[in-house]
Amino acid sequence: MKTLFLLGLIALSAVSVYCEEEEKTEKKETKYGTIIGIDLGTTYSCVGVYKNGRVEIIANDQGNRITPSYVAFSGDQGDRLIGDAAKNQLTINPENTIFDAKRLIGRDYNDKTVQADIKHWPFKVIDKSNKPSVEVKVGSDNKQFTPEEVSAMVLVKMKEIAESYLGKEVKNAVVTVPAYFNDAQRQATKDAGTIAGLNVVRIINEPTAAAIAYGLDKKDGERNILVFDLGGGTFDVSMLTIDNGVFEVLATNGDTHLGGEDFDQRVMEYFIKLYKKKSGKDLRKDKRAVQKLRREVEKAKRALSTQHQTKVEIESLFDGEDFSETLTRAKFEELNMDLFRATLKPVQKVLEDSDLKKDDVHEIVLVGGSTRIPKVQQLIKEFFNGKEPSRGINPDEAVAYGAAVQGGVISGEEDTGEIVLLDVNPLTMGIETVGGVMTKLIGRNTVIPTKKSQVFSTAADNQPTVTIQVFEGERPMTKDNHQLGKFDLTGLPPAPRGVPQIEVTFEIDVNGILHVTAEDKGTGNKNKITITNDQNRLSPEDIERMINDAEKFAEDDKKVKDKAEARNELESYAYNLKNQIEDKEKLGGKLDEDDKKTIEEAVEEAISWLGSNAEASAEELKEQKKDLESKVQPIVSKLYKDAGAGGEEAPEEGSDDKDEL
């Protein structure tokens, strides 16, 4: 196994070089001109540009630096409104005002979170081939829009805001996504950019962008930064090291369906129940009333960040009746405490994955409007034993700021040459080997782009074909992970089991696309597959479920893996002996007939036992191997003693073992 270990070291040391070269190559080869940075948020979006050595966050036509991610169609002509204008008319036109497109993008219609959200939205969501689309009235016609199209409309607005400020057309953008977005969601976001007439030169992770905003001017050596990003609809935690312009992500975790919208919803449900209890009337029957309540609840939530209680007052809310209730900060916290506490689990996971202790974290950077909630700040401070989070950056603008810097890096703006961004892949990737074992090639939280190779062999004599099955996930057995693809390497020349050397190479490019190559080292015969962003990629819920399952079933997994490994060890040992006895150049030519027969019978007995004991436990398999060793080792020891220990070494366990395909 020494060769494989060295190979791992070479692959790992190549990672950083590969990443930096990617950046440099991109700069040299393509002239993009101005590249804007866009934070495409669930509830609000923001745009910035890097010029003349600094970032400018650009205000919209209302003078606001953040723009609601809302689209509406109003009036007899179906006029399209985007941003503030769309949000401002929500209560009079709820059925034709679309928001939260980010909670639909890249997801299936039957996704649990989509089905839960549909119950709360005033607009109609329909099923088109298991993909959600929004149906609204445009003038006198019913029209359907995909989440990509709705997001594209918001991106068009952000593009126009930038063009108005710059006084020229903008064609290129860096767009941010939650770190825990899967490939389908990332690809859908890129597609939205294309629909908006933008070339999305890079998709980057929101917490990474925020770290750039925080660390751009920090020149005080290596620092460990935890970015806690709680926005309107998504939640991410990333651990990074920042060292003089090099931003390296160590680990990332999160929940793509947790944010301010969920906190608002809890308060709305509380008031709807309260109103029904007092008046006997159900607010949900009137979409306008619900949206009026939504608007006022959001205002109340914001007010409670700076005061301990606030009044929620709505004139003529339902059936001409006014609504007036007090909401205290304590009640708001009580309604949402489980959601607030749920943010700490990913923080703990990121610390574990980074192999860092709480005391190793130099700075905690809070990003996203929901981090203004005092209880959220308090929980983080308590978790880190009283450490105060940094307040140096604007939580609403930090992500767009970092995206604008990355745009400057790619377009070759001055003063950005020292900035290098090293991000990670969120899940482990590997292949299936004998016994259904998941053999990992690239671990989760590995810096991308990256490349890793490992040598495997065959599981049967004269095997003409091996099937390379590629999986993604954290469980030890492939049946519990997600299959990304498979392909065959054919035309292997006849050879005993364990002799062919098949090198499998995994390469993840800067866009997170996986390329897998298998090569027979003996013949040079090659085959490869590219795993692209198809609809079969995992949803963030799947990712979270896998990691949670892995924790829950760790004990069961260990038993199954131990059993598979014990079986592989016994099989390899038995077949290795069999091959050596049949080889006149090895043991076969050195043993007398009696000893040879003893070993042959012991080996055949072990192989036969394996065949008839498919469900044997790890302990039974280990016992069987010990039994075989007890019969073989005295004979082999005697042979080498007689030869004065001058010959070749006895066949040791693992001497020539490779994982078998």
Curated annotation (Swiss-Prot):
SUPFAM superfamilies: Actin-like ATPase domain, Heat shock protein 70kD (HSP70), C-terminal subdomain, Heat shock protein 70kD (HSP70), peptide-binding domain
Listed CDD domains: ASKHA_NBD_HSP70_BiP
Amino acid composition bias (Acidic residues), ranges on this chain: 649-661
Signal sequence coordinates: 1-17
Residue ranges, annotated region (Disordered): 639-661
Post-translational modification: AMPylated by fic-1.
Role noted for this protein: Probably plays a role in facilitating the assembly of multimeric protein complexes inside the ER.
Manganese recorded as keyword: no
GO molecular function: ATP binding; ATP hydrolysis activity; ATP-dependent protein folding chaperone; heat shock protein binding; protein folding chaperone
NCBIfam families cross-referenced by the UniProt entry: PRK00290.1 (NF001413)
Keywords in alphabetical order: ATP-binding, Endoplasmic reticulum, Nucleotide-binding, Signal, Stress response
Family per similarity comment: Belongs to the heat shock protein 70 family.
Highest taxon of source: Eukaryota
Upper classification of the organism: Eukaryota, Metazoa, Ecdysozoa, Nematoda, Chromadorea
Stated name of the protein: Heat shock 70 kDa protein C
Localization of this protein: Endoplasmic reticulum lumen
Species of provenance: Caenorhabditis elegans
InterPro entries for the chain: ATPase_NBD, BIP_NBD, Heat_shock_70_CS, HSP70_C_sf, HSP70_peptide-bd_sf, Hsp_70_fam
